[in-house]
Amino acid sequence: SERYDTILCDVWGVIHNGRHAFEEACEALTRFRGGGGKVCLITNAPVPKAQVISYFEPLGVPAEAYDECVSSGDATREELKIRQDQRIWKLGSDSGWERDRFLYEGLDLDFTDPDKADLLLCIGLRDQLNDHPSLYRDELRQGIDRNLPMVCANPDKQVRVGGKLYWCAGALAEIYEEMSGQVIYPGKPHAAIYALALSR
């Protein structure tokens, strides 16, 4: 660890599993910080960092384990800021377990129907546990037919929460690309989230 001054560390599956913290990982990050290193947590959660951090204490992730946190939600918001003049078709639920409405709160966005949109914002599946991505193929075809670029708020295809697997926006983005659609990925493992993390 002496060779590095900064760690960019994933969240899900590394420091917690959505149900409880992984103590050894948190302790290792805390020790790294104690030696003068900086830790920036990066996650593909499609919500701003404030919502991500709000989960940490209940899960047992100590504040001493990190200096900063950057989410795919943060990087997606940066992308949406430069597209506030575009009409957006939003695909995903406002009432899911990640409370996706925080993704676009405070931004002056014009949400509309698919036939009027300039851009498709994919937050995820409406039912992350019970829906299957293939069920959305006909719906995604509307975006393909209108040549809408998709902004994928979470590049992950699935996430494990405790013992359950939940589908994520990345699964729909994969189908969209298979259908020859253009997808913009602000989150991991793509460049935007790392640039944002290093800027902080």
Write out the residue ranges for each language-model feature.
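HAD-like aspartate-dependent phosphatase fold
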Residues: 1-200
